[in-house]
Structures are given as structure tokens and as C-alpha cells.
């Protein structure tokens, strides 16, 4: 696994990047230098602009490009029990609480969260915004801000609340 991040280039979140490096993740500046083989797959969030050198390099050499949401949805949708948490606010708290309840109940859920989950923090996982389980249960935030919520097919859907945060009411009705 290799990667780049504008926060790395800006000197932010050094402890997170040091943690990744210590586990063998090769980090590159976000200048395209890490995208060198057509066999590579570039995974980026929808917040990464087409003008970012990594995206341009991937296009130039013919490397596959996908979004974080598409990759996450593929993993999420393949779980036997998928629980998607949506809404304008409270998603991270709900995912963290549900993940912890399932964990304490003896389940081994995979969890993808938008924030660190304090109950799961330990020396091997000091940030704990994600947890790899046994694949049976997958609990994740699903985001409506960029429309990627439509990629997810949860077996259980939790909608905390809906307000005019990222989309118009008509767009929200279509997504939900």
C-alpha cells in the first residue's frame, strides 16, 4: 500500500503519517511521483480535484482510478450484514456506539467511521477510525454530501436526521 495526502505535504497530522510509515506504508508527496505503473490503482476521495498531480499522472499512464466511496461500497455491500448510518449529523457517534455494542456482544464487526472511536483506541490502533473484523458484520458511515450514499445497499439503514446541509430537499429525497 502506498499513498499521498495534501495534509502530509502541508506538515499536518505527522503522528498519523508516522504511524502508517512504521507499518510499512510508503508515503509520497502529492506531486505524481508515486503513480508510476499502469498496474497501480489510484483511490481518492471525491474531494480530490482532477488537477491534483497524482490524478493527472494516473490518467497519463493509464492506471485505474476509483473513488474511496466506490471501494468502500464494494467492501460494505459484500458483507453478510451491512449497517449503513446516514444523516446530516451524528453519524460518527452512532457508528462508534453501534460498533462498540457489537464488539462487546462478542461480534467482530468491521467498522469504517469518519472519526476516531475512543473505545477502540489502543497502542496498536491509536487513531481507531476504522476496525477490521471478520467480514460478517460491516458498520459504516454512508455519506450523502457527494451522492455516494447511492452506491451502498445496506441490509440495515439508520438515518439519524436530514437537513439542508449539502443537497437540496429534492436531491435528498432521491438519495434517501
Protein language model features and the residues they cover:
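Structural motif
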Residues: 6-8, 44-47
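Structural/interface elements that position substrates and couple domains in central-metabolism enzymes
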Residues: 9-12, 27, 76-78
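NAD(P)-binding Rossmann-fold cofactor-contacting core
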Residues: 2-17
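Cofactor-cradling patches in redox/metallo enzymes
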Residues: 25-28, 44-45, 54
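Short active-site oxyanion
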Residues: 1, 39-41, 136
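Phosphate-binding loop of NTP-binding sites
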Residues: 34-37, 46-176
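Residue-level detector of anion-binding/catalytic polar loops
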Residues: 1-2, 26, 64, 108
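Short acidic low-complexity segments
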Residues: 26-38
Amino acid at each position: 500500500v502506498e499513498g499521498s495526502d495534501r495534509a502530509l505535504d502541508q506538515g499536518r497530522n505527522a503522528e498519523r503519517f508516522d504511524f502508517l510509515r512504521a507499518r510499512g506504508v510508503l508515503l509520497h508527496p502529492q506531486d505524481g511521483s508515486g503513480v508510476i505503473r499502469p498496474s497501480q490503482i489510484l483511490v481518492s476521495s471525491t474531494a480530490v480535484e482532477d488537477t491534483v498531480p497524482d490524478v493527472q499522472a494516473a490518467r497519463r499512464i493509464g492506471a485505474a482510478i476509483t473513488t474511496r466511496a466506490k471501494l468502500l461500497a464494494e467492501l460494505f455491500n459484500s458483507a453478510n450484514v451491512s449497517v449503513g448510518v446516514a444523516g446530516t449529523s451524528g453519524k460518527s457517534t452512532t457508528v462508534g456506539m453501534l460498533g462498540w455494542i457489537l464488539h462487546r456482544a462478542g461480534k467482530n464487526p468491521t467498522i469504517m467511521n469518519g472519526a476516531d472511536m475512543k473505545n477502540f483506541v489502543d497502542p496498536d490502533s491509536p487513531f481507531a477510525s476504522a476496525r477490521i473484523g471478520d467480514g460478517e458484520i460491516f458498520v459504516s458511515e454512508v455519506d450523502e454530501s457527494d451522492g455516494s450514499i447511492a452506491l451502498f445497499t445496506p441490509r440495515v439503514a439508520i438515518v439519524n436526521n436530514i437537513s439542508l446541509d449539502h443537497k437540496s430537499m429534492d436531491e435528498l429525497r432521491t438519495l434517501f
